[in-house]
Amino acid sequence: MRNPPALKAIIAVDATDDLYQDDVHFMDGVLHVDSWEMSQDLDNARPGAPDYRIDEANFRDRFDTRPWMMTYKRQQRDGPFWDRTALKKRYDSLRVPSFHIGGWYDGYRDSIPRILENVKAPVKAMIGPWSHAFPHDPYPEPGMEWRHEAVRWFDHWLKGRDTGILDEPRFAVFVRNWHPPGPYLEGVEGEWRWEEGWPIPRIRDRALYPGPNHALSDEAPEASAHRLRYVPSSGVEAGGPVMWWGDVAHDQRPTDAYSLVYDTEPLAEDLEILGLPKALLNVSADAPRANWFVRLSDVAPDGTVTQVAGAGFNGTHRESAREPKDIEPGVPFPLQIEMHFTSWVFSRGHRIRFAVSNAQWPMMWPTPYLMTTTLHLGGGTRVLLPTVPFEKRRRPEFQPPEPGPRLPGFERLEEETPSGYGEVSSIERNPRTGAAKVVATNQGGVRHPWGTERYRETITHETNDKNPAETSMRGSHRMVVELEGRTLVWEGELLFRSDLEEFFYTYTRRLLENGALVREKTWSDTIPRDFQ
């Protein structure tokens, strides 16, 4: 942080403090590819509204510039490239008062407890039951009028007004109750609660141990082992429709079928967790590269399984994400996997489920070798749940969302998906050949006073359970701007694929005006796999 003197206060919505582990490039240290890079690329390539001036300056400064994702895809391990913008490496550098807002169904939420705990400057935070959206226009419901809180925050720091915002506890958290699995929900049951900050002193870790009979209990079992065959195309449901750790995920049973699964007995009373659950595992693999994925879920009495938390781990990062090392086949080693920030109340009569797998495709790029992994039970393999004993706490009195201002000539056109991003629309599998295909789509648009802007995107992921090294993602993104007497089209086409040793990147940018091709440029690169 540069902390310029004129910067008096910050509000960060859906932010991260770690661009390597906790962003959309290498989630949990594992390669992730989605449609976002194409939409962002075309936004960067085109000139600004309302003139959309197409000239040599635009070509030089925007359209002809090398796609920045080509640089990112070469940075496959943590290190200096990511350190430049990682607040997590230097919390003391943030000296400006900051207000952090996140959502339980957004991929950017882990920074909230870390910043509350580590930043010395004034910090306030809230996290609610919404996705990657502003809280006044949330999905899912309920929302709240965060703009009122923003005015209170800025009035205090910019105008010196006594708004009372610093008299309140620092952390407002929405505690989630059970809901059925997604992918689409009208709303989430729960309640708001004030907490003084983070960590919360009354939270206690409860250890649960996977057992040889696939039970999850308070008692550590004798030593034994469970083996799991790697199915590279599994995990679609665990990744959710947008394919990241921020979705209302599907019923977890299809992914659980390819996982090691451990369940508690039905709970005798409600159990609340709040924090970052941890999985401490002793594992081994018979291949030099393997990823592990852990998920915590709620099994309802009717058998449906709702994902509560999860995380992935690149096994070659077991000692360091900066200096990865191949796995020594057959040799057990410990993993500590911190799941992503969560809140949940497991209801009486429900079961807690812990699942371990080696694939979460297409959210995470598959490792290239066929293999079998082993989970060694006993000897410290366990799950730590951050449990919260009941304590009567004050509740925030947030205002309900208010209608936003209606700007003349501005209208958001209907989007295909609730998230506004490409979501899984079809899944195809061929058991005979091992081939699998997942297609994600979205479309929408905005009407402006100067014209109409529309977009359409399609992303096709393919892999093969018999040869996961040969995995690919093919995407297309099309933006159309309709002006009076003029139609502009920007197109981006990406083919990203892998073999055992390398990634292959080909990207084409295209501009058309009134149906005629104005400019087209293609970039290609061959990138060594760096422990991915």
Predicted regions and their residues:
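Extracellular/periplasmic catalytic domains that process cell-envelope and extracellular macromolecules
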Residues: 3, 92-94, 119, 199-202
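Catalytic cores of eukaryotic secretory-pathway lumenal/extracellular enzymes that build
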Residues: 6-9, 119-140
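Serine-hydrolase catalytic core
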Residues: 67-127
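C-terminal, loop-rich substrate-recognition/catalytic regions characterized by aromatic stacking residues
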Residues: 126, 134-136, 140-512, 516-532
